[in-house]
Amino acid sequence: RELVEACRRNRVDFVWAIHPGQDIKWNEEDYANLVRKFEWMYDLGVRSFAIFFDDISGEGTNPERQTELLNRLNEEFVRVKGDVTPLTVCPTDYSKLWANPTPQGSLAIYGRTLDPSVAVFWTGDVVCSDLTPETLEWVNSRIRRPAFYWWNYPVTDYVRHILMQGPVYGLDTTLTADDLCGLVSNPMEHGEASKLALYGVADYTWNVAAYNPIDNWERGLALLAPEVRDAYRTFAIHSCDTETGYRRDESWETETFRLADRTPERAAALRAELERVVRVPARMEQCANKELLAELRPWLVEFGKLGERCLRALDLMELYAGGDDAAFWASYVANRMTPDQMKAYEAHKSGTMKLQPFYEQAMDDMASGLFERLTGEKPAGCKGIGSFQNLRTTLSKLMFDHDSTTHYTSGVSQQDGDWIGADLGCVRDVHEVAILQGRNSVDDVDFFDHALVEASVDGRQWTALGDSLRTVYDIRWTGEPVPARYVRLRRLESPRTHWASVRSFEVNPVRAERLGFGVEADDLTAALYAFDRNPSTSFLLDGALRFGVPAGAKGYTMLLQPDADAAPASVRQYAADGTLLSETHVDAPLFRLTLESGAARVELEGALRIFEIIAE
């Protein structure tokens, strides 16, 4: 009752909505229970009501039954009361993505049979999508009335680790009351942090034709946090994108770059912005809106850390260019994110479009460059490619992290011809491909149920690796080597409209039998990553690792990260008969070992992370 009265004082219609749910029976008992609840809410002051038939299956989806119920409620409750606003309904077919477009579809049935006063929700072409004349024309021609647009923004129930703080855009400014009867915004669970977006939605609906997203955003920042407006703006401009699904522009005033494109001017400009980022958490503590600050604080903490590691990555670029490999690698491993740091960032992300990718790409580029400088060859790592837009983001790295509990997801519905793949960086002889589709291998729906593995030298002409696959989660191809730079899994004809997910995408995974020397460790599978010619992977040693010396080897360069809290790791060399030839200790992250004459086996014992062991 308090909420209803507060809404009335502020000229807001409080709408009470009910979801009849999966178990509706369409009988008199159900109807009587529904009316009874309406009466209870009416007695508390509610004068606006809605019924939702979204996200259900079974008998509850029957559009004829739905319209019969709505028409009866309209006749026996709304009109009888006299002071109740027209009903609102969310149909089961609330998105073009799965709506039946035919005259027999539920939307067309709504158009023919539903009382014209009832407003009908519509989310657009997909669940989260822009408000366009085209989507309204499509739905309005079927429901025979202007739709009530349900805009799923700034809601983050599908990306709870994100705060949507960017400008409100994607709303067409040529629309009139003939096109839509209303616009409802679905906010985040963070009420204060949602106000920046709601301010934009309110501004748009107040004067559609004159709405300007950036002008509105700038005013909203000053209105919500005037005393820390600049700091709030710095955070907000880097906290806009979802990374998946409904992508939003972010960091549009910031230019980032790859290692090869670094110039002093670009580095100086980025450094200035990153220094502003680092100052944001402390400055935001002066925000007078303590509820807003409390909601933002977990993200602000991680935002400051993001700025710090990006600044260190800039410094590392200079150190890398200087050519002192030992000094560079020592600073490099100190700037790597630990599992705990990554977990904290993943829970409260910002800077996902430019800042975190800058950090990750800079670190990857420098590690790859160092490997190439040490060996004269390109590392064996992969990067994600494909038809889905977010494969260009750092999300695609989840396919290559050797962790089957994580997964890349497309964030949008799959279609025939879609594909997910790997760029090997150069042409290699491909002899094995191993792919884990879906979020699990048992009953997940987010996978290509009809697909083909293919390889290509140039990305234009593709060769099939094996036959087409139907309903296969765990894919493995082996065969005679095929020269290729690109390997992909391409969807073939299928009615499936789910997202697509991949837990693992391996090309030529390292195998003990292919190394040419023996390896012994408690966890042999993990230990092989020390020899996979890819410095982006690593093996956490806590014990002993033993490996044979290949013919012709004179020494090793080891890319390591010693455990600062543990004793220095030991390195021992043994002859073929087991005689100990020498023993030393790891004294630097980039450790060089000269082999003794007759050395046949090396043993590394201690606690440290091994990125690569390179024979020379």
Give the predicted meaning of each segment.
Residues 1-30, 37, 43-47:
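Feature activates predominantly on carbohydrate-active enzymes
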Residues 37, 44-47, 56-218:
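Catalytic-core regions of glycoside hydrolase
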Residues 45-47, 83, 179, 429, ...:
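Short loop/turn motifs at secondary-structure junctions
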Residues 213-381:
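C-terminal functional modules
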Residues 371-430, 436-450, 467-468, 497-499, ...:
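Disordered, acidic Ser/Thr/Pro-rich linker "stalks" and the adjacent N-terminal cap
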Residues 442-507, 565-616:
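Trp- and acidic/polar-enriched beta-sheet ligand-binding modules for extracellular glycan
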